[in-house]
Amino acid sequence: MGHKINPTGLRLGITQEHRSRWYASSKNYPALLQEDDRIRKFIHKKYGSAGISDVLIARKADQLEVELKTARPGVLVGRQGSGIEELRSGIQKTIGDSSRQVRINVVEVERVDGDAFLLAEYIAQQLEKRVAFRRTIRMAVQRAQRAGVLGLKIQVSGRLNGAEIARTEWTREGRVPLHTLRADIDYATKVASTTYGVLGIKVWVFKGEVLSEQAQPMPVGAAPRRRASRRPQQFEDRSNEG
């Protein structure tokens, strides 16, 4: 089951958060969902060179909050924040409401080579430049290992190296526990357009296990806490009273 289902959808509410955080009535829900999709497509199309990893959307009354996780925040912000104003007007034009309040928050990705979407984007760019897929995968694995990820799995499907018959190739380094729900797994897909057709790319990145406060691992060298001895209960025999 863990190998078939989308790892992000399986872990929503456990280790993953929803990309859209808002509530709506059944009447307005489809329109708002399509609006979120248009916003994400607009951002990825217009700012493809900014290395945008994720787009989080929240709604509060008439205010729309958009959080962008990017590897190059300077490309989005621009000089003196001019890029933010351009992005805000572009979002308002996309949703068809120029009076809507749009709040934009730009967050820089700390480990670029440890992000699944940015790794998939790097692989797609190399394949579109006609670099051999085995070398591309090897370089991506090396970059992820330098970023300190615990496990990585990469899968590429299609007419690899221009072969007549499409096939699927994959590689794995380290641990990628897809069946463990507490495992923090970053998953992303990307399509590379080549002269021989399209190639599908999937990337799984294992970043560690998310443990609750009650299940935190014991520090190295610390002695286990002994359970206090339970005092035996004492009962009084009052059957002969009264």
Curated annotation (Swiss-Prot):
Compositional bias of kind Basic and acidic residues: 233-242
Family annotation (InterPro entries): KH_dom (IPR004087), KH_dom-like_a/b (IPR015946), KH_dom_type_2 (IPR004044), KH_sf_prok-type (IPR009019), Ribosomal_S3_C_sf (IPR036419), Ribosomal_uS3_bac-typ (IPR005704), Ribosomal_uS3_C (IPR001351), Ribosomal_uS3_CS (IPR018280)
Name used for this protein in its record: Small ribosomal subunit protein uS3
CDD domains: KH-II_30S_S3
GO molecular-function terms, A-Z: mRNA binding; rRNA binding; structural constituent of ribosome
Keywords of the record: Ribonucleoprotein, Ribosomal protein, RNA-binding, rRNA-binding
A GO CC term assigned to this protein in UniProt: cytosolic small ribosomal subunit
Domain KH type-2: 39-110
GO BP terms, alphabetized: translation
Self-association and partners: Part of the 30S ribosomal subunit. Forms a tight complex with proteins S10 and S14.
A Pfam cross-reference name: Ribosomal_S3_C
Disordered as annotated region, ranges: 216-242
Record family assignment: Belongs to the universal ribosomal protein uS3 family.
Disulfide links within the chain: none
Function: Binds the lower part of the 30S subunit head. Binds mRNA in the 70S ribosome, positioning it for translation.
